[in-house]
């Protein structure tokens, strides 16, 4: 959701990002996903060269900065993640980036894992935020 909204800001005014797969941070460090969840060949097919990943348009930070530099409207972001989600740390990194940029975003976290129970609780909250 984040990548799509930042790639097409003329189409999306905001996005709801629940347990976002912001795995680029771990891939850039190690060249692979934690626990080898994704074969290295697939990582390269999806993300390209891990050494260039953080500087590429696969990185939502790059997309955000590009929109800001071009003085284009930047979609708002609702970001929510469970504190037991295996993607929690990656979401923290992106949240910290958004804070530093003083972005239009709303962040929530709470008990939960990467599953429908968490998403079912936070999707209505995200919709309420997006429809304000």
Model regions and ranges:
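Non-catalytic cap/lid and distal C-terminal segments of serine-dependent acyl enzymes
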Residues: 1-132
């Amino acid at each position: 959701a984040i990548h799509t909204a930042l790639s097409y800001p003329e189409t999306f005014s905001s996005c709801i990002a629940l347990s976002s797969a912001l795995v680029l941070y771990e891939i850039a460090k190690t060249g692979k996903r934690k626990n080898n969840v994704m074969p290295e060949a697939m990582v390269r097919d999806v993300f390209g060269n891990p050494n260039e990943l953080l500087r590429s348009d696969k990185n939502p930070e790059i997309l955000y900065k590009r929109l800001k530099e071009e003085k284009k409207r930047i979609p708002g972001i609702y970001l929510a993640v469970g504190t037991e989600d295996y993607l929690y740390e990656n979401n923290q990194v992106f949240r910290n980036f958004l804070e530093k940029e003083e972005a239009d975003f709303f962040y929530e976290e709470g008990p939960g894992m990467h599953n429908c129970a968490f998403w079912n609780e936070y999707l209505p909250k995200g919709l309420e935020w997006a429809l304000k």
